[in-house]
Amino acid sequence: MTATRHPFASDIDAATRIAEPDFDLLDALVRTDDPDDQAHTLARVVLAAFDNYYAVSRRIPALAQAAFEARDWAATVRLSKIRLGLYTACIDQLVPLLKAGLPELANDEQLWARAEAELLAAIAERYEADFAFAFWQSLRRKLVSDEWRPVSYDTGPAARPKATSAAILKTIATTLPIRPAVIRDILDGAGLRGPWRDRDGDAALAAAAIEAALEPLGPRAGETAKIEIAESGFFRNRGACLVGRVRLRDRGDMPMRNLPLLIALLNEDDGLVVDAVLCDADELQYAFSSTLANYHATNPHYHELARLLHELMPKRPLGTQYSCIGFHHLGKVAVMTEILAEHRRSKEKLDTAPGFKGTVAIAFTMPSSAYVLKIIRDHPTDDYKFDYFDGLDAVLRKYNLVHEIDRAGSMLDNIIYSNVKLERTMFAPDLLDELLESGIDTVTLERGALVFRHLIVQIKLTPLPLYLTTASAADARAAVINLGDCIKNNAAADIFNKDLDGRNYGVSRIRKVYLFDYDAVEPLTDVRVRGDDAPPGPEFEDGVVFRPADMLGGLRIDDPALRRAFRDAHPELMQPEYWQGMQRALRAGKVPRVMNYPAARRLRR
């Protein structure tokens, strides 16, 4: 399918170009000897760099909407990559200039303190004051190579009032049953340019789907209701969605009832369509999962958006809600703050994560924590399957690669911290010993604390083989079938896990299967896929060689019934033609479709 080109496509470079630093300000900073003047100018230099970053980042959601309207799928992928790299690029542009002009700057604590006060005064009335302060902290840490600290943006000089979701919601009063005309008004309110295939028909189907989802809440005909819809479009790859909730008022026999709502939109050759309606918190959580590419939200009020998403998906920590709409640094701070709060609240020790001992990574967690932390070993264990280990930095690059791509709904995102310090008392003794013995290049003990050169944090999963030992027959069958979907989605993202071992996959709280270990991932387009007539083993060829016929044996699915369920659901995965066809599509620059919600929620036409 050839997408229509939108006039904006050739202007993406111009719209997302990072402006040059203000060299007049930089010159003034270098020339002045007055401490107060120097502090004031340094604050202005950094704030100008932040303003440049923030202005470009706020243009991207509108460009993503335009790309969706134009069906320019290559542009949507490009915009996601640009946005992911923008924050670091703006900091990296300024740091060498400051180092060259003021080499003593990194160690001048008094100057930094005065400049920080100037910056905080300048941003005091701005909505994005916390984000500007985060940028300041990131830049200083890059200059000084200092310890990473979770700076609190909810309290202190850059604080802002606590966000409430009501500020970004449009409320539509209605009565039950919900009429198609109400849904049509919501679709019209999205402001999407382009024809609809059948807007009235879609509105009727969506209204019926919402009515069916309301049934367990005991609705009554004529009962008043409110539909609250976020005044924001959410755009990602080939799709878009509208997000909100249906609220039924408290009545004598029933308390206030809330139903999450996501209306998923596609733009097909023959027009815009409502593809699915989701009204379950777990299903919304999957659609907004950090295992997918980030959404571009057209509403700039990121705190209110994150709060709304947390209200709709309360099982997911607030920190990850920021990340899924692209505010990774705020999400990074929120996640570490949550981990430290979990420890203070539970008094639990960090200890080896349940499951199988990693050959490349050491994974650890607290029993009640929502997160798993891991480091990369200096050297793999004796059980390592491959002849050659590329080393710690190469493995970290693979984790970063997964962070920077569309994870296709089947790979966990990673937060990678540098130079982070955790108190020694947080760790169980055996784990502490292993970290210090097997992570010499990564972990050091300094004055009662462990300092991590790198620390990877992911959402906690149950390793698939462990899950299968305790799951019901139905849940186990669903998991192995979902494993096949996971492998297909990874392939659609040009990711191949050459260690197709079930221990590298895990099951989430909402019973979805994800890949979570990335030391063995390779671009699928670089893999040599071979059939039965190929040489008998990879030792005959250079590079990564994959024989699909051998796949099932490596997955460690021991139960014959589960092996049969996997094979029956995904026979194409054992055929080289499937993999070679996916490689051809990826090399041609096509953006394969990825299912971000259950097929059962798609509207039946």
Swiss-Prot record:
The keyword Cytoplasm applies. GO terms for molecular function: [isocitrate dehydrogenase (NADP+)] kinase activity; AMP binding; ATP binding; phosphoprotein phosphatase activity; protein serine/threonine kinase activity. Disulfide bonds: none annotated. HAMAP family: AceK (MF_00747). Its EC number is 2.7.11.5, 3.1.3.-. The lineage of its organism: Bacteria, Pseudomonadati, Pseudomonadota, Alphaproteobacteria, Hyphomicrobiales. ATP binds at residues 353-359, 374. It comes from Rhodopseudomonas palustris (strain HaA2). It catalyses: L-seryl-[isocitrate dehydrogenase] + ATP = O-phospho-L-seryl-[isocitrate dehydrogenase] + ADP + H(+). The active site is at 413. Belongs to the AceK family. GO terms for cellular component: cytoplasm. This is Isocitrate dehydrogenase kinase/phosphatase. It is found in: Cytoplasm. GO terms for biological process: glucose metabolic process; glyoxylate cycle; tricarboxylic acid cycle. Bifunctional enzyme which can phosphorylate or dephosphorylate isocitrate dehydrogenase (IDH) on a specific serine residue. This is a regulatory mechanism which enables bacteria to bypass the Krebs cycle via the glyoxylate shunt in response to the source of carbon. When bacteria are grown on glucose, IDH is fully active and unphosphorylated, but when grown on acetate or ethanol, the activity of IDH declines drastically concomitant with its phosphorylation. It comes from the Bacteria. InterPro entries: AceK_kinase, AceK_regulatory, Isocitrate_DH_AceK. Keywords: ATP-binding, Cytoplasm, Glyoxylate bypass, Hydrolase, Kinase, Nucleotide-binding, Protein phosphatase, Serine/threonine-protein kinase, Transferase, Tricarboxylic acid cycle.
